[in-house]
Structures are given as C-alpha cells and as structure tokens.
C-alpha cells in the first residue's frame, strides 16, 4: 500500500494571527516615540487634577485626552467676525480670523496658525499617520492638519471648536 503524502498546507490561522500580532506591535512601537514632548518642555504646566478643575468635561476630553467633537457641533465653525481664536486651556493666541475659511467639514478650519502658536506631532491612532496639531504653550490637543486647504499654504488646520475661545477685535 502506498501512502499519499498530504500537499503542503497553506499558512495556518495561527501563523497568520502571529504575523498580525507582530505588525500591530510594530505599529504600536512606532507610535510610542512620536507623540508630544513631555510636559516639562512646555511653558504652561498643571497637574491632571488642576486641568480637570480648569476645563469643562468636553474641553478636558478634547484638549487632554485628544478627543474629537462631533462635526457641526461648535458655533465657532460659523464665526465670521474679525478677531483671534485662542486656546481654551491656556489663552494662547492660536489663529487669526484672517486665516479662517469654510472647509465644509463642520469644524473650524484655518490655512495657517499664528507664528509659534502651535506644534505638531505624528498621530497613529486610526492606523495610519496623521499630523496632530497642539497648543505650543502646553501641548493640548487641538485637531489635525491636512494637505487639502486653500492657498497660500495648501493646509487645512481642522480644529475642535471646544478647544478654542474667540476674542473679537
């Protein structure tokens, strides 16, 4: 009697899961060193308890936990007056109304920040890199920057309205 040798098996489910786990681990490690600088590098510093006292729940969620508000939920998306948009966490002037435009996304959008007002880092939270924008004075999360904005920069700073305060001129 001759024995039939089995054909080589396709990669097992277990092997596929191992590869998936390895890739996930690599993505996590890649993201670890790419966030905002440590709080010690910022001009404005508070403890977590102090931030919780200073900010509303929604501001804390956006600014300190890098959350995102619902589109079209902020009245600042439709703000048309001349003035300055400042950080709701520390009052740092971030954007001029001269750089604001209607992106149609439902979030306040700007083609540039005031000089030195914001910093950026790479955010991998949704599986691919995005440019996160944060307050340069303490690192609070503001939103993200995309490459689909108008001239002169071609950038769209898509900002959570709850992270902003508006000061009319």
Language-model segment annotations:
Residues 30-62, 70:
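C-terminal segment of N-terminal export signals and the immediately downstream linker at the start
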Residues 63-80:
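N-terminal post-signal-peptidase region of extra-cytosolic proteins
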Residues 80-109:
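Mid-length scaffold segments of soluble, non-membrane domains
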Residues 84, 132, 155:
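Residues immediately within or flanking Cys/His clusters that coordinate Zn2+
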Residues 87, 135-138:
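Short cysteine-rich clusters marking metal-coordination/redox-active sites
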Residues 91, 139, 162:
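Cys/His-coordinated zinc-binding microdomains
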Residues 96-97, 144-145, 167:
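Short, non-ligating residues that shape and space the ligands of small metal-coordination modules
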């Amino acid at each position: 009697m001759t024995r039939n040798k089995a054909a080589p098996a396709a990669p097992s489910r277990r092997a596929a899961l191992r590869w998936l786990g390895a890739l996930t681990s690599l993505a996590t490690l890649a993201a670890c060193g790419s966030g905002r600088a440590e709080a010690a590098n910022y001009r404005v510093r508070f403890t977590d308890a102090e931030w919780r006292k200073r900010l509303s729940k929604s501001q804390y969620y956006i600014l300190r936990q890098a959350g995102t508000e619902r589109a079209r939920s902020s009245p600042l998306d439709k703000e048309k007056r001349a003035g300055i948009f400042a950080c709701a966490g520390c009052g740092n002037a971030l954007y001029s109304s001269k750089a604001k435009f209607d992106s149609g996304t439902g979030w306040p959008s700007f083609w540039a920040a005031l000089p030195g007002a914001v910093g950026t880092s790479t955010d991998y939270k949704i599986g691919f890199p995005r440019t996160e924008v944060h307050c340069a004075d303490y690192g609070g999360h503001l939103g993200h920057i995309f490459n689909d904005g108008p001239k002169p920069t071609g950038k769209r700073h898509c900002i959570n309205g709850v992270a902003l305060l508006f000061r009319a001129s």
